[in-house]
C-alpha cells in the first residue's frame, strides 16, 4: 500500500483541511507514513501569515526537492496560503512540486456524499470549518489575498457534519473561520453565528462547542447572549486586539478604538464573569513608538488575558502595510517589546492559574499525553491528570493540585459523562 505524509503549519483551519485530505488519501488507497522518506506522496499545507512561517515552508519544500532528486517517483503536493490566487507564480518558483491547489479548494462537503471524507474515528475535539476567506483587509494581513472573500456554509450542511462527527465519537467541535463573527452574511437566509450555535446546541451527544477566530468589530450582543445562555458553548473567546493604540489601530484598519475594545470586553465580562479571553498582538508595527507600545502593554495588563499570542511585525507581500508603510522599527526593538509582552503574559496567567489551586473543574478528556490524560476546562485551560481508567472522551470532575502559567495538574474526582 503506498504511503502519504502530511506536513502542516499554521492555524487550526490548516489542520482541519489536512485532516480532511488525509482521509481522502486513505480512501484512495494510501496509508499514513511515519516520515516523508517512507512516503510516495507528501503534502505540504502552508502558512504565510508571518515571515517566519513562510520561511519554514520554503525550507521544507527545498528539503523535499532533495528527497525527490533521490527518489524521482516521489510526488509532492502543495496547498495552503502560500499558493494564494495565482498558482502559475508558485509553479514557476517551485517547478518540482507535482500538485498545487489553493487553500480550501479541495473537494468539500457540498461536492461529496454526506460524511464521505470524515475520519472513521474522529478526535474527541474535532475541527469544523464553517466559512472561508475574509472581507476585512487589515493592512498587515495577507489572508484575504490568499483565501479570498468570505464564503459561509449553510447551517444545515454544518449541522449534518457535526452530527456525523458526534455519531462517530467526537464530543466537542471547534468551529473555524478567519472571522466567524461575520458568518452567514453571504447566505440567502442571513443567519448569524448565534443562530448556528443555537442549532448545533440541540445535537444529542455533543458536549461542547468552541469557535474561532473572532473580530472585535463584528461581535454582536446576540452572540454574547447566546454564549451566556447556551450551556454547551465554552466560556472561551479569542478576541484579537492587535494593538492598544488608536493611531496604530487606524493604520491597521481594525475598525475600533482602544476604548471601544475595552467597552466590548466589559459587556462580555458582565454577561459571563467566568469568561476566558485570549488575544493576538502585533509589536513593532510601522511607526509604532514607545508610547504607543505602552498603550498595548497597559491594555494587556488591564484586561488580564488567559493567553496572548504576540508576534513581531513582518511585512507580508501584497498587503497595504508592506506597500505603503516603512518597516521602521528595528528588529532588536521588536524583540525587546515581544519579550516584555511574553513576560507579562507569564506573570498574569501564572497568577490567574495559581488562584485555581484546590478548586474543582469540569474537564473534557481528549487523550493521552506522556502517560497522562490531557483535557481542557470549559474556559480552555489545559489540564493533565493521572488515572488507570479509560477516560478518553469522558467529561470528568477534577480537583486542581498544581498550577503553572501553561497548564494545570489535577486529580480525578468522578466521571460526569462517559
Curated annotation (Swiss-Prot):
Its cofactor is [4Fe-4S] cluster. Keywords: 4Fe-4S, Cytoplasm, Iron, Iron-sulfur, Metal-binding, S-adenosyl-L-methionine, Transferase, tRNA processing. It is found in: Cytoplasm. Residues 120-351 form the Radical SAM core domain. SUPFAM superfamilies: Radical SAM enzymes (SSF102114). Residues 346-414 form the TRAM domain. InterPro entries: Elp3/MiaA/NifB-like_rSAM, Methylthiotransferase, Methylthiotransferase_CS, Methylthiotransferase_N, Methylthiotransferase_N_sf, MiaB_methiolase, rSAM, rSAM_horseshoe. GO terms for molecular function: 4 iron, 4 sulfur cluster binding; metal ion binding; N6-isopentenyladenosine methylthiotransferase activity. It is an enzyme of class 2 (transferase). GO terms for cellular component: cytosol. It catalyses: N(6)-dimethylallyladenosine(37) in tRNA + (sulfur carrier)-SH + AH2 + 2 S-adenosyl-L-methionine = 2-methylsulfanyl-N(6)-dimethylallyladenosine(37) in tRNA + (sulfur carrier)-H + 5'-deoxyadenosine + L-methionine + A + S-adenosyl-L-homocysteine + 2 H(+). The keyword 4Fe-4S applies. Its EC number is 2.8.4.3. Residues 2-118 form the MTTase N-terminal domain. Binds 2 [4Fe-4S] clusters. One cluster is coordinated with 3 cysteines and an exchangeable S-adenosyl-L-methionine. Pfam families: Radical_SAM, TRAM, UPF0004. Belongs to the methylthiotransferase family. MiaB subfamily. Catalyzes the methylthiolation of N6-(dimethylallyl)adenosine (i(6)A), leading to the formation of 2-methylthio-N6-(dimethylallyl)adenosine (ms(2)i(6)A) at position 37 in tRNAs that read codons beginning with uridine. Monomer. This is tRNA-2-methylthio-N(6)-dimethylallyladenosine synthase. It comes from Dehalococcoides mccartyi (strain CBDB1).
